[in-house]
């Protein structure tokens, strides 16, 4: 490491100049990879391990990181610190080796907190909408010439990366409540989009514990910091009196400090007015569909307005917003004639939403923007515990589409739970009489089974957080043509 690189490190995190080599266990995850990318660009030696290559590991390798596709004790040799994903168990051989060598082992949020320590941190928390809101704040700050650093849990499509090192004092980051590690962060501004029961295993199944953890997170703000909170959310409204910090509220509610009014949607664009205290009305065109995205934009505008960013910069950023990967992600519109012999087209949209509230928001956005389309969903439930805990909510939400295909539950390391599987969920939905679900036990048959339900005027939602995104990409690459064996005619 040369003198210039050392000087650069001292300017970012003064005491971290003692650190040379940072190793990440589970480096291919979006949150881990984003932090690794920022640190690589700051001049640190980066290494990491994961089970298989993906776009995140490819990007890091292009920046000079050493990537191992195995977990072995020798991978942590010479590391100054080991950063571990919450998905990694404590008996991982690299973790064991690090402890034996007395190398510090920390969670990703602790490293993110160090990056934030000497910057003006803006942390975006909440059950839903974190990734998109983080990208919106980052886009506005970039449009205003503020050159922020950002670390996001999803791909920021305009930048083509999950994270980027800026050269200003601003750091905008997604704050993850799934393992309560966001308590390590000490931002200047915190957004909370909403609070629902999710990741309840972290909170001992106690919703009060989850709510108190969000309060504790907000109390990490300095007394002169600001909490920006969605007052439409009933839990946030309940908690507001307990937030001992300056607050700005936003939402469709009449008493919101930043109020969304007159929302309409045309295709993928939302149009609405934002009313702000002691400011001119802001007439917004947002290049992202759905009322939920209008709320995300309102949060971003609240932060930008507080920072003194010009309205013209805000409006330009929102109108040109390119979204994030796997959040109502348009993959194309394809002719159906090669697929099933029918005339017309099918739009293909990939979406990460895996909680009933998120799936409902995606369906509503699709209905509002394309009301005449036949709405077809290929859904992959994520985790048996979530399917069990939110079973009735899933059944109610999934009844809203015109045709439903369902993959088996993506276990994410969990053991099956009787009655919380896709077959049971299909049976329950079928019993409600609104839609007749099709169980797709073999993902390789997804294209062929989709072809059976397409009408010629379709919007296909590929929905879920597991490996279903690969199916979406495969469908787009084969232009929706079914994979048939021998028989080229499929009706």
Swiss-Prot record:
Known catalysed reaction(s)?
UDP-N-acetyl-alpha-D-muramate + L-alanine + ATP = UDP-N-acetyl-alpha-D-muramoyl-L-alanine + ADP + phosphate + H(+)
What do the Gene Ontology cellular component annotations say?
Answer: cytoplasm
Primary localization: cytoplasm
One GO term under biological process is: regulation of cell shape
The record's family statement is:
Belongs to the MurCDEF family.
Q: What does this protein do?
A: Cell wall formation.
Protein name per the record: UDP-N-acetylmuramate--L-alanine ligase
């Amino acid at each position: 490491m040369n003198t210039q690189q050392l000087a650069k490190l001292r300017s970012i995190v003064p005491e971290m100049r003692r650190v040379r080599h940072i190793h990440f266990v589970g480096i291919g995850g979006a949150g881990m990879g984003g932090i690794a990318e920022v640190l690589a660009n700051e001049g640190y030696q980066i290494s990491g391990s994961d089970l298989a290559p993906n776009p995140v590991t490819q990007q890091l390798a292009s920046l000079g990181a050493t990537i191992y596709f195995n977990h072995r004790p020798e991978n942590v040799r010479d590391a100054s610190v080991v950063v571990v994903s919450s998905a990694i168990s404590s008996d991982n051989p690299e973790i064991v080796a690090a402890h034996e060598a007395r190398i510090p082992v920390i969670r990703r949020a602790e490293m993110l907190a160090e990056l934030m320590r000497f910057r003006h941190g803006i942390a975006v928390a909440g059950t839903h909408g974190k990734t998109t809101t983080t990208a919106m704040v980052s886009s506005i700050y970039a449009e205003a010439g503020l050159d922020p650093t950002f670390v996001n849990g999803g791909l920021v499509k305009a930048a083509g990366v999950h994270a980027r090192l800026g050269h200003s004092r601003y750091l905008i980051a997604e704050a993850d409540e799934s393992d309560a590690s966001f308590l390590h962060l000490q931002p200047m501004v915190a957004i909370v989009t909403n609070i629902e029961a999710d990741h309840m295993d972290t909170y001992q199944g106690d919703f009060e514990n989850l709510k108190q953890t969000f309060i504790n997170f907000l109390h990490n703000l300095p007394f002169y910091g600001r909490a920006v909170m969605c007052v439409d959310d009933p839990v946030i409204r309940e908690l507001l009196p307990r937030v001992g910090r300056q607050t700005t509220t936003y939402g469709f509610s009449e008493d919101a400090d930043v109020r969304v009014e007159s929302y309409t949607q045309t295709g993928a664009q939302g149009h609405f007015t934002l009313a702000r205290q002691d400011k001119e009305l802001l007439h917004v065109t947002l290049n992202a569909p759905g009322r939920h995205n209008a709320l995300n934009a309102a949060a971003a505008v609240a932060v930008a307005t507080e920072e003194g960013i010009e309205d013209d910069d805000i409006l330009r950023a929102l109108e040109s917003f390119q979204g994030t990967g796997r959040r109502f992600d348009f993959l194309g519109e394809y002719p159906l004639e090669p697929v099933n012999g029918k005339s017309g087209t099918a739009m293909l949209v990939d979406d990460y939403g895996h909680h009933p509230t998120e799936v409902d928001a995606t369906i509503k956005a699709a209905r509002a923007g394309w009301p005449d389309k036949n709405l077809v969903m290929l859904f992959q439930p994520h985790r048996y515990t979530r399917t069990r805990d939110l079973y009735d909510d899933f059944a109610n939400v999934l009844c809203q589409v015109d045709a439903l295909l369902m993959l088996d539950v993506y276990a994410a390391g969990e053991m099956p739970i009787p009655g919380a599987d896709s077959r049971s969920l299909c049976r329950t939905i079928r019993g409600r009489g609104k839609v007749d679900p099709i169980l797709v036990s073999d993902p390789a048959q997804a294209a062929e089974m989709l072809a059976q339900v397409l009408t010629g005027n379709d919007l296909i939602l590929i929905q879920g957080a597991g490996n279903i995104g690969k199916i979406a990409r495969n469908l787009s690459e084969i232009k929706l043509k079914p994979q048939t064996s021998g028989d080229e005619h499929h009706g």
